[in-house]
Every structure is written in C-alpha cells, then in structure tokens.
C-alpha cells in the first residue's frame, strides 16, 4: 500500500512540475498540430537556391499529400495525375501557403529547401501529421537559366512512381514500386529557356518511405549548375 501511494505521489509531483514549467503544454500543442520539423527539410531563407556541384534541385513547393489508391502501374498512375482533384494541377503556379480543397479537405502548399540531394516526402508528410501511404504528392520548382540551353535532359529518381513535366510537357515517368536511384529515369533531349522554366512532378506512394530527386544534365551527362531555383513570387 505504501509503495502504491509513493508511486501516485511521484506521478503527481512530475505532472505538477511539467505543467508549471510549460513542458506538458508544449508537448500537447505539438502533437495536435504535427510532429515537429522534418529532419532534412527547412524553410527557404534566401531568394534563390543554386545547385551544388552535383546539380540537384533543392528548392521545391510541395503540396500536402492527396489521398489516392496507391496503385503504381502505368495506367493507374497516369489516371491519378490526370484527375483534376483540384483546379488546373498541370498549370497552377501557387505560392507558399496557398491552399486547395480536395474532397472537402484543405491542403497547403509548402516551400521547402532540402539539405540532402533528395526531397524526403515521408519526413515532409509525417512532420505535418499527414498520411504517408496511398498518397499523391505534387511538387513544383521554378528553375531560372541565365541562357538558353539545348539538348539537356531531366534526370530523376523517385520512390515510388512519378511523372514529370517541364514547361507544361510530360518528359519522363517511372512506374511500379521502386527505391529512389539517382538518374533512374532520364528524359529525352529538351531545351531550357533563358529565364524561367517550370518543373512539375507528381509522386505516387503506396506505403513506406517516399522521396524524389531531380537535376538537369548536359549532353555529356554533366550536371548543370549555373541555374537558380526560386518560388513563384520571387
């Protein structure tokens, strides 16, 4: 009996200390709004992001996950990305914190910089308290080129399936369950205009980890680094 009373008294003291210090309140607030920041994703702090020597695009505008069936075949993925779950998914150019309504739920666009070569969508969704399985992610990068560059290729990797567009034209896609591999898919030759180019991606995940990476390659497959990535309002 004395042991039980001592245990209850100890718990009471711990709760009192947590409440008085604000720690319990902070933990509760965090769990109700999300799970804390994603380990490899940060809010942009500069007006432009330049690729490193490896050429990967590290600034993206990502929409919170849209629920889907999570089927990864070519026909299923193409059907998912061409369904207008919100207005003009293949032409919209949103700003950070813009929202769309999908099946009665409000989803938000988030500007993110990745500290790695890839964008970890599992971390992105988990940190926001959003689903990570049977979902579709939309991502947009505004890529600025100081010159017109011909015969370049968009090289991508994704987990799992993905479809990619450059300046409104579909250029590459990956299907079925897969891990992200650098340059797993390489587009046909295309032209980057001088000035602004819009790269758009749709990534479908059935379950587990999910991420993507992308970069532009010169004809000799050397990464292009004299680009900048900005947001729509920059």
Language-model-derived ranges and their functions:
Residues 1-9:
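N-terminal secretory signal peptides that target proteins for export/translocation
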Residues 145, 154-158, 203-205:
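Non-cytosolic beta-sheet module surface loops
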């Amino acid at each position: 009996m004395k042991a039980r009373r001592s245990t209850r008294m100890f718990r009471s003291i711990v709760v009192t200390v947590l409440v008085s210090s604000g720690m319990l309140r902070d933990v509760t607030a965090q769990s109700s709004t999300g799970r804390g920041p994603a380990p490899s994703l940060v809010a942009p702090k500069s007006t432009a992001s330049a690729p490193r020597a490896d050429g990967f695009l590290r600034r993206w505008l990502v929409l919170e996950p849209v629920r889907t069936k999570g089927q990864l075949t070519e026909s299923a993925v193409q059907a998912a990305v061409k369904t207008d779950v919100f207005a003009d998914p293949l032409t919209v150019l949103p700003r950070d914190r813009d929202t769309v309504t999908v099946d009665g739920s409000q989803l938000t666009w988030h500007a993110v910089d990745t500290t790695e070569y890839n964008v970890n969508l599992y971390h992105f969704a988990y940190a926001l308290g959003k689903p990570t399985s049977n979902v579709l992610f939309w991502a947009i990068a505004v890529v600025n080129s100081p010159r017109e560059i011909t015969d370049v290729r968009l090289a991508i990797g994704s987990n799992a399936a993905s479809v990619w567009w450059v300046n409104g034209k579909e250029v590459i896609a990956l299907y079925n369950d897969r891990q992200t591999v650098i340059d797993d898919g390489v587009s046909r030759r295309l032209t980057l205009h001088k000035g602004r180019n819009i790269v758009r991606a749709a990534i479908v995940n059935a379950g587990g980890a999910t991420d993507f990476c992308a970069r532009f390659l010169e004809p000799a497959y050397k990464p292009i680094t004299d680009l900048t990535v900005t947001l729509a309002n920059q």
